[in-house]
């Protein structure tokens, strides 16, 4: 598939990009970092921190719901917003539904909690992401409804038959 690069302007110029690993001064291979550290980065250096923190939460919900266990620090990144002099969460990329894996994140939710293993764990972490329980629950419902239409999207992309059956456990 040919995709439009999110780190380029319409006229081909570069938009500065760094991975979450770079932002946390990590080589990306260690497993000691947490999403709450990215919240801290956004609060400190973000151009629109609350919007991006809420978007990060949505992605954690999506990753959990599609069993994306490839959520390491090199698969999250930031683009520099020169107009607002700060970093923005980049568009999501490299999302991999994994039908045979446990629903467990590579990156920890908080420095104390460990990998994300359940809806309850995510919901308990919502305050770190500046979300009230009701807001977090509403986001969960919205993302779950979108994920529920995965078959329609997959068929539209040409998936059929056994491919749909094979991927179903990731979305169950």
List each language-model region with its residue ranges.
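Anionic ligand-binding catalytic core segments
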Residues: 1-73, 77-172
């Amino acid at each position: 598939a040919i995709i439009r690069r999110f780190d380029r302007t319409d006229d081909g110029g570069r938009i500065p990009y760094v991975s979450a690993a770079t932002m946390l001064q990590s080589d990306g291979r260690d497993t000691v970092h947490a999403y709450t550290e990215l919240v801290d980065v956004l609060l400190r250096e973000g151009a629109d921190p609350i919007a991006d923190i809420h978007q990060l939460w949505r992605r954690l919900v999506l990753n959990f719901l599609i069993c994306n266990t490839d959520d390491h620090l090199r698969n999250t990144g930031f683009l520099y917003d020169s107009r607002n002099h700060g970093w923005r969460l980049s568009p999501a990329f490299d999302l991999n539904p994994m039908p045979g894996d446990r629903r467990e994140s590579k990156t920890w939710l908080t420095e104390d909690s460990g990998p994300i293993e359940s809806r309850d764990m995510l919901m308990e972490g919502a305050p770190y992401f500046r979300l009230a329980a009701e807001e977090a629950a509403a986001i969960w419902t919205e993302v779950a409804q979108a994920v529920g239409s995965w078959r329609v999207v997959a068929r539209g992309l040409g998936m059929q038959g056994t491919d749909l059956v094979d991927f179903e456990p990731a979305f169950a």
